[in-house]
A protein has these predicted regions:
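Aromatic-residue-lined binding/catalytic grooves and analogous aromatic/hydrophobic interfacial grooves
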Residues: 1-4, 8-224
Length: 225
């Protein structure tokens, strides 16, 4: 399983592969945020679109999901994309809001912070992503973030431990008090990766929780400090 957030192309790409053909059987569904009001609809034969607004401030947003399978079958019904007996499946996700960065707003204007139409931007991003395909998206993502990521290297232990041990097992051992320098290196670089993927010139800086938590209103209101 591979996942990356492609800033350059404004799309999240998730690829599932198995070591044997025809073994990908899974269902993709989107769980709406509990403090929003919206509706789910089919978006083409292999896609879903969720159009909604937040209940507290009315901010509009759209989430699109599109599936691409090699082998097997795809079905799209009741707000779910079901994949059966595929060799490989890629899910593409685009999302946007109508929020506009405005450093000098007219507070009497109810549209002071309203910008793009998210239905249009997410459609354009999705069409571009589908046309490029996973391999092109991955290369562009890698080239984009690696230019920043590869500026720093951290090696805490010259006798590097095996990198093949699953992260879940590493965390389990670490909680039991077993030292793992590789895990500490991994967490350091993972934090850098998230920051690189969440804050770039021209956008808002990363807030207290970053953009990767699962709440509309995170702890401490996700303020900027």
């Amino acid at each position: 399983r591979q996942r990356q957030m492609c800033i350059r192309d404004s799309v999240m790409a998730i690829r599932f592969k198995a070591d044997r053909p025809g073994k990908q059987n899974l269902t993709f569904s989107y769980s709406p945020n509990p403090v929003s009001t919206g509706s789910m609809s089919a978006d083409g034969a292999n896609g879903l679109a969720y159009t909604a607004h937040l209940d507290n401030n009315g901010m509009q947003y759209v989430v699109r999901i599109h599936a691409i399978a090699k082998g097997g079958t795809l079905s799209n019904a009741n707000g779910k994309i079901t994949v059966k007996n595929a060799d490989e499946v890629v899910f593409l996700v685009t999302a946007d809001t109508d929020y506009k960065i405005n450093f000098d707003p007219d507070f009497k204007d109810p549209k002071a912070y309203v910008g793009v139409n998210p239905a249009e931007t997410t459609r354009q991003w999705m069409d571009n992503a589908v046309a490029m395909g996973y391999d092109v998206l991955f290369k562009q993502h890698y080239d984009d973030y690696a230019a920043l990521f590869n500026r720093v290297k951290l090696q805490l232990n010259p006798d590097a431990q095996s990198a093949n041990l699953p992260t879940g097992k590493r965390l389990q051992n670490y909680r039991k008090g077993q030292p793992d320098f590789y895990l500490e290196e991994l967490y350091y670089q993972f934090g850098r990766y998230l920051l690189i993927a969440s804050s770039r010139p021209g956008n808002m800086p990363a807030n207290l929780q970053g953009i990767w938590h699962n709440n509309v209103d995170g702890p401490w209101s996700c303020l900027l400090y």
